Swiss-Prot record:
Keyword Chaperone: no
Region of interest (Disordered), residue spans: 1-26
GO molecular-function term, one example from the UniProt record: dGTPase activity
Protein's UniProt name: Deoxyguanosinetriphosphate triphosphohydrolase-like protein
Taxonomy of the source species: Bacteria, Pseudomonadati, Pseudomonadota, Gammaproteobacteria, Alteromonadales
Top-level lineage group: Bacteria
BP-aspect Gene Ontology terms: dGTP catabolic process
Keyword hit for Metal-binding: no
Transmembrane segments: none
HD domain sequence ranges: 59-250
Family, per entry: Belongs to the dGTPase family. Type 2 subfamily.
Keywords: Hydrolase
Length: 444
């Protein structure tokens, strides 16, 4: 077990429950799994819109699959690196990170994220991973003021981008649009980091680090002209979670697209098979030469076998890499794919992006969600003490009276909505068909 500070919680707990012998991370996993924020993932878009088909993944089923892959990666690393067993704490830790990793993503996927980022452009921005950190540490009502009150190591593990918005944001942003219908996502990419509103909590998470480790951990890549800066480092646990997420995205979202007929065997062979036939790795060359036949087979068991083969291939190609510049073991070691498998995974991710995410039908759904979120924000911002639900009004007034960022309260409220709830609320506010008989929605 690593140093005890990583097991600490911001709020000291003295819960004496009968015969409760769970580890700190088993408790964290339970809190995430039983949270309202986690349950809402069942009705949030992964890639394909909720309701398009009964087969596809939602963010909840995606998170469950990421958790399974993450524990598989952990098991592989323990076998490959037995000398580093003390690094690998409870399996529940990795499960916790994987289950929680998407918990802050707003309705309508990337469209909702860009919409909230634009509406928050003068108020600290918005980004799904930053919102995840915010939900876990403050918004989810497991405690009064400390969110789920998770262990410090768990919070370190969800920090995919350990940096503050203000230190990463490129100041010379695009000109504001004259009409929100004209907003282009490419012009308003979210800053990937922690909101400045949550700086004190970030400081608490990093408190056990020595100064040199903290300074290095917060370093950024040099930004291209006109681009936001990107963070450089993440913890060991976070690196496992991120790899599991990437594998699930590339492989399972591919499966959804195949089943729904969005991609074709011809596209696969021309874009993937032709690219990977020159791989330096023999397993990649041999498997990808024929695996497309199974993926696009009319026999479902063959497709499932191919999906399992791909996941296994990537999981077993992961090892530990060491950065000697760090003293803290949780930062010194990261999980990483072999270079050839990393390239192969990138080919799959780009295939999904090119033929699925960029497909006009998918982009139309994303655009529709983008407009829904921006119009909801405009409405609530125009008269928050009239339109926000009672409890959210109280939070808004409290922030306003304390001179805090009250716009963040509106972003918190909208980002917590499911796709269906946001669409229904939008209808209640803007659809003339509903007249004056508006069904009062239960607050999230």
């Amino acid at each position: 077990m690593i140093a005890s500070p990583w097991h600490e919680r911001r709020l000291n707990e003295d819960k004496k429950r009968r015969n409760d012998h769970r580890s700190p991370f088993q408790r964290d996993r339970a809190r995430i799994l039983h949270s309202a924020a986690f349950r809402r993932l069942q009705a949030k878009t992964q890639v394909l819109g909720v309701g398009m088909n009964d087969f596809y993944r939602t963010r909840l089923t995606h998170s469950l699959e990421v958790s399974q892959i993450g524990t598989g990666i952990r098991a592989q690393l323990k076998l490959k690196q037995p000398q580093h067993l003390p690094l690998f704490d409870s399996m529940s830790l990795i499960e916790s990170l994987c289950l929680a990793h998407d918990i802050g993503h707003p309705p309508f996927g990337h469209g909702g994220e860009v919409a909230l980022n634009y509406m928050m452009r003068n108020h600290g921005g918005f980004e799904g991973n930053g919102q995840t950190f915010r939900i876990l540490t403050g918004l989810e009502p497991y405690t009064e003021c400390f969110g789920m009150n998770l262990c410090r190591r768990t919070l370190l593990g969800v920090l995919k981008y350990p940096g503050l918005y203000s230190s990463l944001h490129h100041n010379s942003q695009q000109a504001e649009v004259n009409n929100i219908r004209q907003l282009k996502p490419a012009d308003w990419p979210p800053v990937k980091g922690v909101f400045d509103d949550d700086k004190a909590i970030l400081d608490w998470v990093l408190a056990p680090l020595i100064d040199s480790d903290r300074e290095r951990f917060l370093q950024t890549h040099t930004a291209a002209t006109g681009k936001h800066k990107r963070t450089r480092y993440k913890s060991l646990d976070c690196s496992i979670m991120e790899l599991a997420d990437d594998i699930a995205y590339a492989v399972h979202d591919l499966e959804d697209a195949i089943v729904m007929g969005i991609v074709s065997s011809f596209q696969w062979h021309s874009d993937v098979t032709e690219t990977l036939k020159n791989s330096k790795d023999s397993w990649i060359r041999e498997e990808f030469a024929t695996i497309g036949d199974k993926l696009f087979s009319h026999h479902h068991h063959q497709r499932k076998d191919a999906i399992g083969t791909l996941v296994n291939g990537f999981v077993t190609a992961i090892d530990l890499k060491e950065d000697l510049a760090f003293t803290e073991p949780l930062l010194r070691f990261n999980a990483a794919l072999d270079d050839e498998f990393d390239s192969a995974l990138e080919v799959l991710k780009q295939f999904v992006y090119k033929f699925v995410i960029r497909k006009p039908e998918i982009q139309m759904l994303e655009y529709k969600g983008q407009q829904t979120v921006m119009e909801l924000f405009e409405a609530f911002e125009s008269d928050p003490e009239r339109l926000l639900p009672t409890h959210t009004q109280e939070r808004w007034r409290e922030s306003h009276n304390k001179g805090l960022n009250c716009h963040r309260v509106i972003a918190d409220y909208i980002s917590g909505m499911t796709d269906e709830f946001a669409a229904r609320l939008h209808q209640q506010l803007f659809s003339p068909k509903l007249g004056s008989m508006i069904e009062l929605s239960h607050e999230l």
